[in-house]
């Protein structure tokens, strides 16, 4: 199988072809996703909640991310694999580079970091040293204590303009992908159209270039609160492989996320 690359996603954006991505944390699910053609995966610090049972992503360490990244890479050797740098793993550019090197050696193709213009120097340093970067704006879970909970971000002209400014700054610094989480559809559209790099949405409507879901949300195995943007594809299909195929098909056709999964 031909490897999926950042260039593959750039071509999807140019061709206006939506693409699906998903979180993965272990060998078996990564292998299954790859076999079904779902070839862009994220080892997210969401594993702190979905795998480790914490109430936030904050306890996750670089060692945790590296461990799960290696497992996913063994299951999906040709996927485009993103890995989160967890809380306090990129407080300085130098620290970011050291920790990025750890997860890249474990098998990641790219690191994802949360934050806006304050990260410009870090993004520049990483990209200059051959570490591809995916930005993450909107609801950034590592900042949950500042936000006062998991809330929609970017509502109102001032907040929306700031997120757009952040997105443009990250792109100019060298970021090659951007995740937008829990923002109004209208703002997601503005940002997606303003950037040359692919934008992946989660809770950002169907106007972004791609979509991502936490695998536990996609299969309805998340305990407690279910995010508005989540959809249980396993409930409709009764089979994990069929659920993966349906998720991909609905993203590519624009059916998912629907209005009921979106914010304004």
Curated annotation (Swiss-Prot):
Its EC number is 2.1.2.11. The active site is at residue 181. InterPro entries: Pantoate_hydroxy_MeTrfase, Pyrv/PenolPyrv_kinase-like_dom, Pyrv_kinase-like_dom_sf. GO terms for molecular function: 3-methyl-2-oxobutanoate hydroxymethyltransferase activity; magnesium ion binding. It catalyses: 3-methyl-2-oxobutanoate + (6R)-5,10-methylene-5,6,7,8-tetrahydrofolate + H2O = 2-dehydropantoate + (6S)-5,6,7,8-tetrahydrofolate. GO terms for cellular component: cytoplasm. Its main location: cytoplasm. GO terms for biological process: pantothenate biosynthetic process. Binds 1 Mg(2+) ion per subunit. Pathway: Cofactor biosynthesis; (R)-pantothenate biosynthesis; (R)-pantoate from 3-methyl-2-oxobutanoate: step 1/2. It is an enzyme of class 2 (transferase). It is found in: Cytoplasm. Keywords: Cytoplasm, Magnesium, Metal-binding, Pantothenate biosynthesis, Transferase. 3-methyl-2-oxobutanoate binds at residues 45-46, 84, 112. Its cofactor is Mg(2+). Mg(2+) binds at residues 45, 84, 114. Belongs to the PanB family. Homodecamer; pentamer of dimers. Catalyzes the reversible reaction in which hydroxymethyl group from 5,10-methylenetetrahydrofolate is transferred onto alpha-ketoisovalerate to form ketopantoate. This is 3-methyl-2-oxobutanoate hydroxymethyltransferase. The lineage of its organism: Bacteria, Pseudomonadati, Pseudomonadota, Gammaproteobacteria, Enterobacterales. The gene is panB.
